[in-house]
UniProtKB/Swiss-Prot annotation:
It is a multi-pass membrane protein. It comes from the Eukaryota. This is Olfactory receptor 9A1. The lineage of its organism: Eukaryota, Metazoa, Chordata, Craniata, Vertebrata. Residues 46-64, 121-140, 218-239, 293-314 are cytoplasmic. It comes from Homo sapiens. The chain crosses the membrane at residues 25-45, 65-85, 100-120, 141-161, 197-217, 240-260, 272-292. It is found in: Cell membrane. The keyword Cell membrane applies. The keyword Aminoacyl-tRNA synthetase does not apply. Residues 1-24, 86-99, 162-196, 261-271 are extracellular. Belongs to the G-protein coupled receptor 1 family. Pfam families: 7tm_4. Odorant receptor.
Length: 314
């Protein structure tokens, strides 16, 4: 029966509704956020790589997290900006749409895994400080990163393949600023109920699976902190986890709102807002969350700026 339908070979993305003036304001806002996101995360990556004081597992993981933030936001934001500037050009081929969705989901899965790894790292640092260098040695965290990258990209092969095995004949218009899976399911002329349920279960498995080590780690961290008699000691212990905990709340919260829902094809406005939180706001906040209250990083960054100034002066 599906043979009578012709599937779309390209999609037109509606992006953001509104007048040309509104689009220009959105373009200026998102371009500024994107530029600050890239520059801020690049600064962290360079500082972590060149400063010997930051050669520890947590900063190694932070550097990888910054790389991921740049890659994740770059999967959709440049195309979104182009669409705001020239709305009539928001056309994407089926192959490009599949590639964008695959990269976005794979990098997102990898980011969740990395957040879980960083939580375990904080657990070891707080609860087993004397064994930290033994447990989190160089070979351990390098293998953890390799496994995370491999699993991140392998885990999303079937979900994306299953999505693009559908026939998209209801419409070639996606009411979003990137190739959102919910919108793709919405324009399919096939019954997607079972497929949506399987995708929902996989999203639950990935998100909750990476959330478990985070919850367990912070349970032990809080338990250990409560045993510290002095308030200053408690604050010092928790300060090592505060930035990561803040990032976890924002990251997992937005992912749960966006993906862990039985019905993937819910309101486009809702998906657009939460997608902006994942693709624009969180990557933008990342450099500030991890560095503003980190005295060690601020010192390293200051030393680096002084060194650059001396080189330029000479």
């Amino acid at each position: 029966m599906l043979g009578n339908y012709s599937s779309a070979t390209e999609f037109f993305l509606l992006g953001f509704p509104g007048s040309q003036e509104v689009c220009r304001i959105l373009f200026a806002t998102f371009f500024l956020l994107y530029a600050v996101t890239v520059m801020g995360n690049v600064v962290i990556i360079i500082t972590v790589c060149v400063d010997k004081c930051l050669q520890s597992p947590i900063y190694f993981f932070l550097g990888h997290l910054c790389v991921l933030e740049i890659l994740i936001t770059s999967t959709a934001v440049p195309f979104m900006l182009w669409g705001l500037l020239l709305p009539s050009t928001q056309i994407m081929s089926l192959t490009a749409c599949a590639a964008q969705l695959y990269l976005y989901l794979s990098l997102g899965t990898l980011e969740l895994a990395l957040m879980g790894v960083m939580a375990v790292d904080r657990y070891v640092a707080v609860c087993n400080p004397l064994r930290y260098n033994i447990i989190m040695n160089s070979s351990t965290f390098i293998w953890v990163i390799i496994v995370s990258w491999v699993l991140g990209f392998l885990s999303e092969i079937w979900p994306v393949y299953a999505t693009f095995q559908l026939t998209f004949c209801k419409s070639s218009v996606l009411d979003h600023f990137y190739c959102d899976r919910g919108q793709l399911l919405k324009v399919s002329c096939e019954d997607t109920l079972f497929r949506e349920f399987i995708l929902f279960l996989m999203a639950v498995f990935i998100i909750i699976g990476s959330l478990i080590p985070t919850i367990v780690s912070y349970t032990y961290i809080i338990s250990t902190n409560l045993k510290i008699p002095s308030a200053s000691g408690w604050r010092k212990s928790f300060s090592t986890c505060a930035s990561h905990f803040t990032y976890v709340v924002i990251g997992y919260g937005s992912c749960l709102f966006l993906y862990v829902k039985p019905k993937q094809t819910q309101a486009a406005e809702y998906n657009r807002v939460v997608s902006l939180l994942v693709l624009v706001v969180t990557p933008f906040l990342n450099p500030f969350i991890f560095t503003l209250r980190n005295d060690k990083f601020i010192q390293a960054f200051g030393d680096g700026m002084k060194h650059c100034y001396k080189l330029l002066k000479n």
